[in-house]
Amino acid sequence: MADEADPGELVAHARRTAFPRVDRERDRLAWSWSELAALEPRGPWALREPDPKAAAAAWEDIQLVVVPGLAFTERGDRLGYGKGYYDRAIAAARSGTRAPRFVGFAFEAQVLPELPMQAHDQRLDGLVTEAGLRWFI
């Protein structure tokens, strides 16, 4: 989304990067290995996503997931866009044998004292803003 903090520089330093795409058939996020330059606007929201034919990435092979959001708290709470894609992805990854770290990426102005949380909402492991990195684990 245009008003989110841009993780492009962070991605540029990664050795290997998996990006999410919305799997509309299964109503979930799927992760594929791709280069940042190869992402193209796709789907109803025109989000930059990898080619659906790109090699799938397994949770066991991913070390860190950058998670977008509208707002965050100092406890790792996150307010997303209401579709639950990241909450379901985080829950699925954490149910496996080895899950990556899930870290929010935002502007400091998006960090609030409190957010409404529901039973299905997943807390993040950390948060990166222009003020630095906070770990919640």
Spans of features found by a protein language model:
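A structured binding-face within diverse protein domains that lines the active/interaction site
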Residues: 48, 68-70
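N-terminal active-site beta-alpha-beta segment that forms phosphate/nucleotide-binding
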Residues: 1-61
